[in-house]
From Swiss-Prot:
One CC-aspect GO term: GABA-ergic synapse
GO BP term, pick one: cellular response to acidic pH
Residue ranges annotated as motif Selectivity filter: 644-647
Residues binding resiniferatoxin: 513-514, 552, 559
CDD domains linked: TRPV1
Region (Interaction with calmodulin): 768-802
Residues annotated for Ca(2+) binding in this entry: 647
Organism of provenance: Cavia porcellus
Residues the record lists as Phosphoserine modifications: 118, 504, 775, 801, 821
Ranges: ANK repeats: 111-139, 154-187, 204-229, 250-277, 286-322, 336-359, 394-416
Name under which the protein is recorded: Transient receptor potential cation channel subfamily V member 1
Feature: compositional bias, Polar residues: 92-105
Ranges for region AD: 685-713
Length: 839
């Protein structure tokens, strides 16, 4: 690139001669330098030199003379857009616009040009020397590092973001230099908070990058210089989109530090004196930092360990910084708390931690959801907080798990986590069981009435039939009316179910198997009613289909009995998995071989059969004798081969007997021998594979029945049947009484002995002010009003808060951890033991 300079034509005749050298950056490396010639520039001493806009702009040529024999010299060329020189004729000064370069005097140091590429290259290589002249350049050109010409045009990346992405051994010396330059050009806040502007990384700032690079020094430096700790990175890469690469962390710097397991940065962001982060801040979908931690959980052991640890630390730190803030009760835009979000996404490890969290520190004990009532050896009686769990609250954990999609991972296993397992059992034992058995009895009575009404239907004439004044007709009409009323009940119940649950097509036949069958039963019955009053005898066909489905739906009520319920689940799974696949392959074989056989058969070759000039291949085309020249009859005959009742010589009306026999033998081998035996093998494998899964599915089905029964109650009735008891378990941070709706569960833990973990009663088993045997304690798996009468935990709290925690005694034998609920038969071990609490 050639550099040019313009020189004032009205200069003095004897200007000083000076030697100038070209800036090496302005010389083309591929061009050859011609022999230097002596030259002289006439420049005014009072001329001010300023930098121009770009090297690419066209410049006016400079005037120079070359004298042979003088020493060769190269001019130093700098950019100037305005040259001011004194002119006696024009007044005090005369200003002239220059397009490219001006020539400095020998007393001034030449300045270097900078563009985006040169700055990016310098910061990427951690080269501070190349940026020595950046500040004078910006000051003289009145530009800032945040100007558009210094940003990546596609992503909006600045030189600070470029430097953050190019750390050398965890540091880049140009970062502090760039921040100092931005401070001196009055653009520090804008510069340090500049973010990506493209749709993929939109919103990511230097602070996000420093946290992602796990660099505490840079995080501190950025926050000290005014970095926004609430900046949200909401580009496509930071959203949770299925099938697309990315990492969702909650958009905010605090959430990023938490989701990448950086507790030191989390504490710094919350406790720094420059700009503390808001612990309750939400992202674009309403998630707080606790929601973000739940989102990044993946149910692996290492991940669950760090997520639960970070969750606990943030919860405790938030309670200390903001004592009155109920961080765990904040909901996102879907109305989910972190607990409900863990349930809806199948994060069973995080769910179990939140439900069973017990914090022994007195100042943070109000964060506990589990309180140890008493402990005796391995036996623990625990009180579980039912807030956000029971169905009395919106988006409760029980409803979220029971009514979630079948694609939710660990859906069946989550109901086995305490206190959910015991809570559902308590509801079933106290009231749902009786209501369910009553409904079962009513349905059996309904089906008997429906069957009798269908069996004794009139057969003479066309419907509707007139009622005769006989006792039998009165009973028949009454049965028909009751049957139709039941059909309307199942129809509207199905409509209500589909409107409330809105199951997807993919999960419709998995989660809504029974509901679909009841709904189809009602449709057949109502269609039969319409045909009956339309004077059509075809009403009988719809009625018998409804009758058959009605008795089949009796399997729905087997979920009230464990063994029959598990058996019904296995039948359902085999129908939906093995039998559906078998039927698809079998129908393909049946249709294919039927079309081949029916094409081969010709009835006209048999004189006993009437000759038909035009063959109709349909179910209605039958001669006086058996004719297999139709697809319908041939399919029926081939079906007999499937069940082993076929005859290879069921007809003689065909040509090419060898071909006919080969077709039949191939069909028998593929269906009767191969497909049927494969179906039997698959069913046996399915039974072995889903034995335990079927039990969990049965528990889920029973849980859905329990919740449906509760939802059918009025609000006043729900409160009357609510499990647990309202108790004062301590004090809130502001000194008020802390009341919780608690549910008691007796557990056995062979690794944690009688240690002071929170609230422990001195007299184990003495929760009512009266003595009770250990066997009763073991059998009492639920909380009733009688158990909780005149019982409060406030005295225990006051006593526990004044004592220091005792260190756990070393165990003599290291046993494998076991945590579960005591069964009634376990009490036999303690038959001869002294009653706890007695002297």
């Amino acid at each position: 690139m050639k550099k040019r300079a313009s020189v004032d034509s009205k200069e003095s005749e004897d200007p000083p001669q000076e030697d100038y050298s070209l800036d090496p950056l302005d010389v083309d490396a591929n061009s050859k330098t011609p022999p230097a010639k002596p030259h002289t520039f006439s420049v005014s001493k009072s001329r001010n030199r300023l930098f121009g806009k770009s090297d690419l702009e066209e410049s006016s040529p400079i005037d120079c003379s070359f004298r042979e024999g003088e020493a060769a010299s190269c001019p130093t060329i700098t950019v100037s857009s305005v040259v001011t020189s004194p002119r006696p004729a024009d007044g005090p000064t005369s200003t002239r616009q220059l397009t490219q370069d001006s020539i400095p005097t020998s007393a001034e140091k030449p300045l270097k040009l900078y563009d985006r590429r040169s700055i990016f290259d310098a910061v990427a290589q951690n080269n501070c020397q190349d940026l020595d002249s950046l500040l004078p350049f910006l000051q003289k050109s009145k530009k800032r590092l945040t100007d558009t010409e210094f940003k990546d045009p596609e992503t909006g990346k600045t030189c600070l973001l470029k430097a953050m992405l190019n750390l050398h051994n965890g540091q880049n010396d140009t970062i502090s230099l760039l921040l100092d330059i931005a401070r001196q050009t009055n653009s520090l806040k804008e510069f340090v908070n500049a973010s990506y502007t493209d749709s993929y990384y939109r919103g990511q700032t230097a602070l996000h990058i420093a946290i992602e690079r796990r660099n505490m020094v840079l995080v501190t430096l950025l926050v000290e210089n005014g970095a926004d700790v609430q900046a949200a990175a909401n580009g496509d890469f930071f959203k949770k989109t299925k099938g697309r690469p990315g990492f969702y962390f909650g958009e905010l710097p605090l959430s990023l530090a938490a989701c990448t397991n950086q507790l030191a940065i989390v504490k710094f962001l919350l406790q720094n004196s420059w700009q503390p982060a808001d612990i309750s801040a939400r992202d674009s979908v309403g998630n707080t930092v606790l929601h973000a931690l739940v989102e990044v959980a993946d149910n692996t052991a290492d991940n669950t360990k760090f997520v639960t640890s970070m969750y606990n630390e943030i919860l405790i730190l938030g309670a200390k910084l903001y004592p009155t803030l109920k961080l765990e009760e904040l909901t996102n835009k879907k109305g989910f708390t972190p607990l409900a979000l863990a349930a809806s996404s199948g994060k069973i490890g995080v769910l179990a931690y939140i439900l069973q969290r017990e914090i022994p520190e007195p100042e943070c004990r109000h964060l506990s959801r589990k309180f140890t009532e008493w402990a005796y050896g391995p036996v623990h009686s625990s009180l579980y907080d039912l807030s956000c769990i029971d169905t009395c609250e919106k988006n409760s954990v029980l409803e979220v798990i029971a009514y979630s999609s079948s694609e939710t991972p660990n859906r069946h296993d989550m109901l086995l986590v305490e206190p959910l397992n015991r809570l559902l059992q308590d509801k079933w034992d106290r009231f749902v069981k009786r209501i369910f058995y009553f409904n079962f009895f009513i349905y059996c009575l309904y089906m008997i009435i429906f069957t009798m009404a269908a069996y004794y239907r009139p057969v003479d004439g066309l419907p509707p039939y007139k009622m005769k004044n006989t006792v039998g007709d009165y009973f028949r009409v009454t049965g028909e009316i009751l049957s139709v009323i039941g059909g309307f009940h199942f129809f509207f119940r199905g409509i209500q179910y589909f409107l409330q649950r809105r199951p997807s097509v993919k999960t419709l036949f998995v989660d809504s198997y029974s509901e679909i069958l009841f709904f189809v039963q009602s449709l057949f019955l109502l269609a039969s009613v319409v045909l009956y009053f339309s004077h059509r005898k075809e009403y009988v066909a719809c009625m018998v289909f409804s009758l058959a489905l009605g008795w089949t739906n009796m399997l729905y009520y087997t979920r009230g009995f464990q063994q029959m319920g598990i058996y019904a689940v296995m039948i359902e799974k085999m129908i939906l998995r093995d039998l559906c696949r078998f039927m698809f392959v079998y129908l393909v074989f049946l249709f294919g071989f039927s079309t081949a056989v029916v094409t081969l058969i010709e009835d006209g070759k048999n004189e006993s059969l009437s000759a038909e000039p035009h063959r109709w291949r349909g179910p209605g085309c039958r001669s006086a004798k058996n004719s297999y020249n139709s697809l319908y009859s041939t399919c029926l005959e081939l079906f007999k081969f499937t069940i082993g009742m076929g005859d290879l010589e069921f007809t003689e009306n065909y040509d090419f007997k060898a071909v006919f026999i080969i077709l039949l033998l191939a069909y028998v081998i593929l269906t009767y021998i191969l497909l049927l035996n494969m179906l039997i093998a698959l069913m046996g494998e399915t039974v072995n594979k889903i034995a335990q899964e079927s039990k969990n599915i049965w528990k889920l089905q029973r849980a859905i029945t329990i919740l449906d029964t509760e939802k059918s109650f009025l609000k006043c009735m729900r409160k009357a049947f609510r499990s647990g008891k309202l108790l004062q378990v301590g004090y809130t941070p502001d000194g008020k009484d802390d009341y919780r709706w608690c549910f008691r569960v007796d557990e056995v833990n062979w690794t944690t002995w009688n240690t002071n973990v929170g609230i422990i009663n001195e007299d184990p088993g003495n929760c009512e002010g009266v003595k009770r045997t250990l066997s009763f304690s073991l059998r009492s798996g639920r909380v009733s009003g009688r158990n909780w009468k005149n019982f409060a935990l406030v005295p225990l709290l006051r006593d526990a808060s004044t004592r220091d925690r005792h260190s756990a005694q070393p165990e003599e034998v290291h046993l494998k951890h076991f945590s579960g609920s005591l069964k009634p038969e376990d009490a036999e071990v303690f038959k001869d033991s002294a009653v706890p609490g007695e002297k």
